């Protein structure tokens, strides 16, 4: 099949989308997916939690069942959020050739990507993304700001400054959220925070252009995030959908997450699920597109340091909960998803099988 260039300015106006973007009928959204049932996920008042250290049982149950909840009273300045969206709009309004100055290279997880057209030739997502690394490690205080100038030019300095501030704020917020999750697991409140304090987060700006045939394609296909934690702010268009459990899957029951301007959606990824020895869930989700308007979202992925070994705290391993995953580093899992495997519904299972084959063992008894 001939290669296709994802130029949002052109494709969003086409009546028929290219075949590479058409998903199989059993994976594509139904024509009436704009009215799917909403999922009820708990809301954590973060300011109240930080003051008291207590959470509701509904939060712990959500982490065990599907790994989704929302946080409010999080301390993120609404003016910073508004400017982050304004810069997102400004970036995606630029000509394709200009955005491609920051083109994502094969095997890398940062840069501009237009629908993965360079990596795959079918079931392409109807989106373009801009991803960049950020770090709280000493010497990296200007990492994001410098990246925008180095990759795109001096005229992007303000944009880089905005996202530097945004990443700094989101790093602090994500570390606070790890305390919520530690309490949900019955651990000491700060027990997981140190694991991520010197980590390698990634920030992503998502743009889903309008599509004349939204029932044939997806903005992001069904997948579990390979990362540890995802903190998502979605605009008022909506499009995030979750498959919360096996019962919903059997009924084909995707559930919509209603946008909430004052909240961040938190979802647990595969790496965090492994860190909890499977006590917390990483569940399937996807993004649908809109037939009339563009959708944008700001996504922050919390990750440990690349060389940090992901291994559960001893308190989470016992006779009733034997080791569910082998030890691995975040670098190993990241490289697996960038070089060997397209993240989907079975990424972690495929990764575990790959580790076992590479290391020459069949069980986890050694752990």
Swiss-Prot record:
Cofactor note: Binds 1 Fe(2+) ion per subunit.
Protein name according to UniProt: Gibberellin 20 oxidase 3
Top-level lineage group: Eukaryota
Annotated EC: 1.14.11.-
GO biological process: defense response; flower development; gibberellin biosynthetic process; gibberellin metabolic process; regulation of growth; response to light stimulus; unidimensional cell growth
Binding site for 2-oxoglutarate: 208, 295, 297
Example GO molecular function: 2-oxoglutarate-dependent dioxygenase activity
Cofactor needs: Fe(2+); L-ascorbate
Domain Fe2OG dioxygenase: 198-304
Keyword Ribonucleoprotein: no
Keyword Cell membrane: no
Keywords: Dioxygenase, Iron, Metal-binding, Oxidoreductase, Plant defense
Note: Plants silencing GA20OX3 exhibit a semi-dwarf phenotype, and show enhanced resistance against the fungal pathogen Magnaporthe oryzae and the bacterial pathogen Xanthomonas oryzae pv. oryzae, and increased expression of defense-related genes. Plants over-expressing GA20OX3 exhibit a elongated shoot and internode phenotype, and show enhanced susceptibility against the fungal pathogen Magnaporthe oryzae and the bacterial pathogen Xanthomonas oryzae pv. oryzae, and accumulation of the bioactive gibberellins GA1 and GA4.
Enzymatic reactions: gibberellin A12 + 2 2-oxoglutarate + 3 O2 + H(+) = gibberellin A9 + 2 succinate + 3 CO2 + 2 H2O; gibberellin A53 + 2 2-oxoglutarate + 3 O2 + H(+) = gibberellin A20 + 2 succinate + 3 CO2 + 2 H2O
Annotated binding of Fe cation, by residue: 223, 225, 285
PROSITE patterns documented for this protein: FE2OG_OXY
Pfam families: 2OG-FeII_Oxy, DIOX_N
Homology family: Belongs to the iron/ascorbate-dependent oxidoreductase family.
């Amino acid at each position: 099949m001939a290669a296709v260039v994802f130029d949002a300015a052109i494709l969003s106006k086409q009546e028929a989308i290219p075949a590479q973007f058409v998903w199989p009928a059993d994976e594509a959204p139904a024509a009436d997916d704009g009215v799917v049932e909403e999922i009820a996920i708990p809301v954590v008042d973060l300011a109240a939690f930080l003051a008291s250290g207590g959470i509701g049982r509904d939060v712990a149950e959500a982490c065990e069942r599907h790994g989704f909840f929302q946080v409010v009273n999080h301390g993120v300045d609404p003016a910073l959020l508004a400017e982050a969206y304004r810069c997102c709009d400004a970036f995606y309004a630029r000509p394709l050739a200009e955005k491609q100055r920051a083109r994502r290279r094969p095997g890398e997880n940062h840069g501009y990507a237009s629908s993965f057209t360079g990596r795959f030739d079918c079931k392409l997502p109807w989106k373009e993304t801009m991803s960049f690394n950020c770090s709280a490690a000493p010497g990296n205080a200007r990492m994001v700001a410098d990246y925008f100038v180095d990759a795109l030019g001096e005229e992007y300095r303000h944009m880089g400054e905005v996202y530097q501030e945004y990443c700094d704020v989101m790093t602090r917020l994500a570390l606070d959220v790890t305390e919520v999750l530690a309490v949900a697991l019955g651990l000491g409140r700060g027990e997981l925070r140190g694991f991520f304090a010197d980590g390698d987060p990634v920030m992503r700006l998502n743009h889903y252009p309008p599509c004349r045939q939204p029932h044939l394609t997806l903005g992001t296909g069904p997948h579990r995030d390979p990362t540890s934690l995802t903190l998502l702010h979605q605009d008022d268009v909506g499009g995030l959908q979750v498959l919360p459990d096996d019962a919903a899957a059997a009924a084909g029951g995707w559930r919509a997450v209603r946008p909430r301007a004052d909240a961040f959606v938190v979802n647990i990824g595969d790496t965090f699920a492994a860190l909890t020895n499977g006590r917390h869930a990483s569940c399937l989700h996807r993004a649908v597109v809109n037939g009339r308007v563009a959708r944008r979202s700001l996504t922050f992925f919390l990750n440990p340091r690349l060389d940090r070994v992901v291994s559960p705290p001893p308190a989470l391993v016992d006779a009733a909960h034997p080791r569910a995953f082998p030890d691995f580093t975040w670098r190993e899992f990241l490289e697996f998803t960038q070089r060997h495997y397209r993240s989907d519904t079975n990424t972690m299972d495929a990764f575990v099988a790959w580790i076992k084959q590479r290391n020459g063992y069949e069980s986890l008894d050694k752990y």
